[in-house]
């Protein structure tokens, strides 16, 4: 049993969404497989896990390259993935145990969501799972110029919740996200190992 008291010293808590707070990854995998079939290609959804935390455009490009699909069709692939995501994700996603940490610190510490997902998907999930009130700030892929592993997402979160980045902790499930948190000068709680990693 994790003792949440280890998070007491931090000014602000910043959470990744996909795979950390909400179990969307199997749905994304299903959607990628369906998109590949639609275009007559076999997409390896393992690539999505390998590039966890990356933008959908980056993941699409890597899948297309691996499947020998011409990259000039990336806009068609992205449109198909977007449409399927809007259909599948809100109906099939559920909260992960990490959300108990959010509930535990709600109204005690400022809490931000820093995600590589687009705002529309985040808003749909917030509505479906009725969790929007738990967050003081939300930063999506649409709100930043640079994406994970760049620290911009998490630095923007810290700015919005008015917390010193070095006094924040990031909760992540993917290597790119862990790297982004450490690059932002923040401690990172890796939900896979349940350990805190420090940039210092």
Curated annotation (Swiss-Prot):
Domain of life: Bacteria
MF (Gene Ontology): beta-phosphoglucomutase activity; sugar-phosphatase activity
GO BP annotations listed: carbohydrate metabolic process
Protein family: Belongs to the HAD-like hydrolase superfamily. CbbY/CbbZ/Gph/YieH family.
Name of the protein in its database record: Uncharacterized protein HI_0488
Organism: Haemophilus influenzae (strain ATCC 51907 / DSM 11121 / KW20 / Rd)
């Amino acid at each position: 049993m994790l003792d949440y008291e280890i998070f007491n010293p931090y000014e602000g808590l910043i959470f990744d969404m996909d795979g950390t707070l909400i179990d969307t990854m199997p749905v994304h995998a299903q959607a990628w497989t369906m998109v590949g079939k639609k275009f007559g290609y076999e997409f390896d959804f393992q690539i999505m896990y390998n590039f966890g935390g990356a933008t959908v455009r980056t993941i699409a490009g890597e899948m297309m390259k691996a499947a020998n699909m011409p990259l000039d069709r990336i806009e068609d692939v992205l449109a198909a993935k977007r449409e399927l995501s809007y259909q599948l994700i809100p109906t099939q996603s559920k909260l992960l145990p990490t959300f108990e940490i959010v509930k535990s610190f709600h109204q005690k510490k400022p809490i931000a969501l820093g995600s590589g997902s687009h705002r529309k998907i985040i808003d749909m999930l917030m509505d479906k799972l009725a969790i929007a009130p738990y967050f003081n700030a939300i930063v999506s892929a649409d709100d930043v110029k640079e994406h994970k592993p760049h620290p911009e997402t998490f630095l923007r979160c810290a700015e919005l919740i008015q917390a010193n980045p070095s006094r924040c902790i990031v909760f992540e499930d993917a290597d790119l996200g862990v790297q982004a948190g450490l690059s932002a000068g923040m401690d990172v709680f890796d939900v896979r190992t349940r350990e805190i990693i420090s940039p210092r």
